[in-house]
């Protein structure tokens, strides 16, 4: 069985990766943990409020980016930017969760998993560095990086 056209595997793989990079899971995989952290967060601290505002803004921007991709309103190759943004956002959420729970983060399996797994988001679907290269070369038209 062949998916796509025989001899066109690389192009088919690139098309599949475009789809993988923009799934909503890129944005919301730690959202339940974030909501738990919100319950424990010290909202009297202005730095905590600032971080909450940044995360909430990130969720809104991420939803717009993912929606544009799904509706095919984004330029070709822009999924790399969406993936980078959502990945960085998920790491920010994991950092907030870890800071909010403190040492208790290591006592809850779900929290521990979310915090420890977060750096992996920069690898799945292509590393963030590769995504930046794709964005520069395919979207912005910058010259290729020397090989």
Predicted regions and their residues:
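Glycine-rich phosphate/cofactor-binding loops in nucleotide/flavin-utilizing enzymes
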Residues: 2-24, 101-147
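Generic recognition of well-ordered alpha-helical segments
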Residues: 12, 33-36, 85, 92, ...
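Glycine-rich beta->alpha junctions and the first turn(s) of the following alpha-helix
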Residues: 1-62, 121
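Generic, well-ordered alpha-helical scaffold segments in large soluble proteins
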Residues: 16, 36, 40, 65-68, ...
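Generic structural signal for hydrophobic core residues of well-folded globular domains
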Residues: 37, 56, 73, 97-101, ...
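C-terminal helix-coil-helix/basic helical segment that borders enzyme active sites and/or dimer interfaces
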Residues: 46-49, 59-110
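Catalytic-loop motifs flanking and including active-site residues across diverse enzymes
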Residues: 9, 29, 58-61, 82, ...
């Amino acid at each position: 069985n062949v998916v796509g056209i025989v001899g066109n595997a690389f192009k088919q793989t690139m098309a599949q990766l475009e789809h993988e990079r923009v799934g909503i899971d890129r944005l919301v995989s730690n959202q339940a943990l974030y909501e738990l952290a919100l319950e424990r967060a010290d909202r009297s601290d202005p730095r905590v409020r600032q971080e909450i505002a940044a995360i909430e803004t990130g969720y809104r921007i991420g939803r717009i980016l993912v929606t544009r991709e799904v509706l095919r309103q984004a330029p070709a190759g822009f999924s790399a930017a969406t993936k980078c943004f959502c990945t960085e956002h998920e790491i920010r959420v994991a950092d907030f969760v870890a800071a909010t729970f403190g040492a208790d983060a290591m006592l809850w399996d779900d929290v521990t998993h979310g915090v420890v797994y977060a750096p992996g988001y920069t690898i799945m679907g292509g590393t963030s560095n590769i995504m930046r290269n794709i964005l520069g070369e395919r979207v912005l038209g910058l010259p290729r990086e020397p090989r």
